Design a protein with these regions (language model features):
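Charged helix-capping and loop-helix junction motifs
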Residues: 129-136, 163-168
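A short alpha/beta connector and helix-capping loop motif
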Residues: 102-122
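Bacterial N-terminal signal peptides
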Residues: 5-16
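Short histidine/acidic/glycine/proline-rich micro-motifs that form metal-
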Residues: 122-126, 189-192
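Acidic (Asp/Glu)-rich catalytic clusters
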Residues: 106-113, 131-148, 216
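Short beta-strand and adjacent tight-turn residues that come in two discontinuous sequence segments
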Residues: 119, 149, 209-211
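C-terminal active-site subregion of NodB/CE4 polysaccharide deacetylases
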Residues: 19-93, 98-100, 154, 158-248
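Residue-level detector of structured alpha->beta connecting loops
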Residues: 66, 113-115, 143, 205
């Protein structure tokens, strides 16, 4: 416990004092998580797994630093209409729709009454390994935003034109029909996009889209918004270092 307290103290100074609301066009960090669970020994991409204990410490650190998690919709509204954001806004996003995003992440954020952003691969709404629709509805009721991550998670830069329409517009339509929410934002699978993909995302009615490019999200690039990937190897110190480095 003393070691945890010392680590928290060591990374406690991050940003200077700021007003209670951010003005229009402020860059905002968007965190990117995948699985909130220990990595199995045979996992091919171990850094996609963040230990639940690390996730709890990271969220506690955000709270101590007075960050205020918001949805991507609130960020978009600030950038486009000037709707105020809270002090130190941050978006906490989760890709694909893993079960642990409900059993671990949702329940942790619920303690703080914080929203998350769930980028759902529609075919991942299944009994084994993914989210069930009833769990997604509980997340929505707690203020979470649901966004589209295609139907089957392909590399969109290499699919045919008809399939591109199905994966992009079809995923939005499926989520809107099932959950009765707007689904205004898109997340590119594996961060893969090109001009053709962006054009289809716009055509499907999305307001903006997130990538896997590293950095703060900025309003000039609404359809290529940067995010901050949180890896299993980051721990608390690496997590804080990423946010501290981008704040400079």
């Amino acid at each position: 416990m003393l070691r945890v307290a010392a680590t928290l103290a060591a990374v406690s100074v991050l940003l200077p004092a700021a007003p209670h609301a951010f003005i229009r066009k402020t860059p905002v960090p968007i965190l990117m998580y995948h699985v909130i669970a220990p990595a199995p020994a045979i996992a091919p991409y171990r850094d996609l797994y963040v230990k639940p204990s690390d996730f709890v410490l990271q969220m506690r650190w955000l709270k101590r630093q007075r960050f205020h998690p918001v949805t991507l919709q609130r960020v978009y509204d600030n950038w486009t209409t000037g709707t105020p954001l809270p002090f130190r806004p941050i978006v906490i996003s989760f890709d694909d729709g893993y079960l642990s995003q409900y059993t671990r992440a949702y329940k942790t954020l619920l303690r703080y009454r914080w929203p998350g952003v769930e980028n759902i691969e529609v075919n991942f709404l299944q009994p084994f390994g993914g989210l069930r629709p009833w769990r997604v509805r509980k997340m929505i009721a707690a203020g979470w935003e649901i966004d589209a991550h295609t139907l089957t998670h392909p590399d969109l830069t290499h699919v045919s034109a008809p399939r591109l329409v199905r994966e992009v517009a079809g995923s939005r339509a499926a989520l809107r029909h099932r959950f009765h929410v707007p689904v205004n934002f898109f997340c590119y699978p594996s961060g893969r996009y090109d001009a053709r993909v962006i054009a289809e995302v716009r055509r499907a009615g999305f307001l903006a889209a997130t990538t896997t490019n590293y950095g703060l999200a900025r309003p000039p690039g609404l359809f290529t918004l940067d995010r901050i990937r949180i890896n299993g190897s980051d721990g608390l110190a690496g997590f804080a270092s990423k946010l501290q480095g981008l704040a400079r």
